[in-house]
A protein has these predicted regions:
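C-terminal motif of bacterial Sec signal peptides marking the signal peptidase cleavage site
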Residues: 15-18
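N-terminal export and membrane-targeting signals
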Residues: 1-11
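Subset-of-secretome marker
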Residues: 2-4, 20-265
Length: 265
């Protein structure tokens, strides 16, 4: 597979973790054991609690397809109340590092990367996307880029599997499955379009009631290529102040006016 074609799978890694930022209510458990029911309630309450707070998320991931690998790492700071945030991701492929930057400003997200800079008009550095219509207009790749880093979907069949210290915080580790019935129509559509299948989810919840780490393994498909994806997100600084600098209007271009592979439905 050519390098550029493999890079088109990267948004799927973001999509796999982009289905929990809607602030949904804690999901009720459908399990039959008390311990699992309690664990399910605890984890979903932690997800809902964190979805309301500003947070810093460090993200690392591995995308494997056709015998090739993409490693990605980065971090972001997002405030769901003001709908503002910044995200930077570095994508490693074939000895090269491809940067991807995002700025969220209310109902608009700006995306910049050398990956698609050749598609942009002269003098333009940033794609401008409308958050509300990103999925319908541009497909699942763009939908993923409008979601909160480190977000988690509602979970079910949760079981406690151990304890661990994450960045100095004592946590309880759980394994779980995604409760797809609790996803929004837009989230379901994006996952269906990319043939996303979730594996077991691992979640680390601290005594403060917040999720401090999550690991998601999935398989997905884009452009006829199937990929196996593993993404780990480590969350910290809940309640922090988030500052953003919006790109100058003269450097932005409406994404609907630019044809970029992976960003059209």
């Amino acid at each position: 597979m050519r390098g550029r074609a493999l890079l088109l799978l990267v948004p799927l890694a973001l999509l796999a973790t982009a289905c929990g930022s809607g602030g949904s209510k804690p999901a009720a458990s459908s399990t039959t054991t008390t311990s699992s029911a309690n664990a399910t309630a605890t984890v979903n309450q932690a997800i809902a609690k964190g979805a309301k707070q500003p947070v810093h998320a460090a993200v690392s991931g591995l995308v494997t397809a056709s015998g090739q690998q993409i490693r990605m790492s980065g971090s972001g700071d997002v405030d769901p109340k003001s709908q503002t945030g910044t995200i930077h991701v570095s994508i490693g492929l074939g000895g090269q590092q491809v940067p991807l930057d995002e700025v969220l400003d209310g109902k608009t997200v700006y995306v910049s990367s050398s990956f698609f800079s050749s598609f942009l008009p002269s003098g333009k550095k940033w794609l401008k996307l409308d958050v509300a219509s990103a999925s319908n207009t541009f497909g699942p790749a763009a939908f993923a880029l409008t979601e909160k880093p480190g977000a988690l979907p509602p979970l079910q069949d949760v079981h406690q599997v151990g304890t661990a210290t994450v960045d100095g915080v004592q946590t309880t580790k759980y394994s779980a499955k995604v409760d797809r019935s609790k996803l929004s129509p837009a989230q379901k559509s994006a996952l269906k379009s990319s043939h996303v299948t979730f594996g077991t989810i691992e979640v680390w919840v601290g005594s403060d009631g917040y999720v401090h780490r999550a690991r998601i393994e999935t398989s997905a498909q884009a452009g006829g290529q199937k990929a196996n994806i593993a993404v780990t997100s480590t969350m910290s600084n809940y309640g922090e102040s988030v500052q953003v600098t919006v790109p100058p209007a003269g450097q932005t271009v409406d994404a609907s006016k630019v044809g970029i592979p992976g960003f059209s439905s």
